[in-house]
C-alpha cells in the first residue's frame, strides 16, 4: 500500500481538526513549494527526514536492447533523495507492516 497525498490530507483533517478543503490545500501547497524549489535549482532540506537534491547526469553511450544499436543517452537533470540519519534509523528499526498486523491467529 502506498501513502498518497489524499491520505496525508485525511490525516491532517483527523489529527488537526482542520477542514478537508484546508487539509488538501495545505498538502498541495507543501508539495508545490518543494517542486518550485527543485525547478529553480535549490536543494530541499527537511530536518529529521532528508534532502532532495538535483543531480546533473552527463550524456553517456547506451544501447537499444531490441536492436543492439548504439545510441547516446542525453544529458539530463534528475532529482535524488538522501534520507537523513533519523529517518534511516527509524526505518531500519521499524517492524514491517505485515509483521505488525500479524496477530498470530492463523
From Swiss-Prot:
Transcription among keywords: yes
Q: Which BP terms from GO are recorded?
A: DNA recombination; positive regulation of metabolic process; regulation of DNA-templated transcription; regulation of translation
Q: Which Gene3D superfamilies match?
A: IHF-like DNA-binding proteins (4.10.520.10)
Q: Where is the composition biased (Basic and acidic residues)?
A: 89-98
The UniProt similarity line reads: Belongs to the bacterial histone-like protein family.
Q: Which HAMAP family match?
A: IHF_alpha
Name of the protein described by the UniProt record: Integration host factor subunit alpha
Organism encoding this protein: Tolumonas auensis (strain DSM 9187 / NBRC 110442 / TA 4)
Amino acid at each position: 500500500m502506498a501513502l498518497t497525498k489524499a491520505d496525508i490530507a485525511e490525516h491532517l483533517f483527523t489529527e488537526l481538526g482542520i477542514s478537508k478543503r484546508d487539509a488538501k490545500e495545505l498538502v498541495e501547497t507543501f508539495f508545490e513549494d518543494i517542486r518550485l524549489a527543485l525547478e529553480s535549482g535549490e536543494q530541499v532540506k527537511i530536518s529529521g527526514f532528508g534532502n532532495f537534491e538535483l543531480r546533473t547526469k552527463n550524456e553517456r553511450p547506451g544501447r537499444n536492447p531490441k536492436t543492439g544499436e548504439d545510441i547516446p543517452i542525453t544529458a539530463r537533470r534528475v532529482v535524488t533523495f538522501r534520507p537523513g540519519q533519523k529517518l534511516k534509523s527509524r526505518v531500519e528499526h521499524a517492524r514491517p507492516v505485515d509483521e505488525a498486523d500479524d496477530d498470530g491467529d492463523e
